[in-house]
Amino acid sequence: MDLFIDGKPILLKTPWHLIDKDALVWHGVTQHYLGFSPEYEYMRRMPLIYPSRIYNDLTIYLEERHGFMSKWFHKIDGRRLSEFNLLGAYADRFMPEEFHWVDTSKEPLPPLVVKQGWSWGGFAAMKDEWDMLYAKS
């Protein structure tokens, strides 16, 4: 499975109205930090690949809106930030040409390349599988 198309990292996005209600918590916090309402949810599938410069660009953008990160970032608790949605929404708004976007409401999902779960839902459902995998190693 290639993670790039035409030299651009593949990023998935799904319209918010199609997202499970448990994940809607990420919309408001993403909107709060970015200052615009993202049309899509971007925490769709691992791995997520971003050019290194986006971290600096996003930091500058956030600090222009909220002040130095060292003053507020450590105070964020619980479900008050989704770094994957911040990165995705920022990339989609300000550097869309640097990615190959897949709108999951219009295109099929690419094949999985890693096993992933949802940590906020707990690990009980995955524990038996992990125990079996670790026992084999």
At which residue positions do the language-model features occur?
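Conserved catalytic core of nucleotide-sugar-dependent glycosyltransferases
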Residues: 2-75
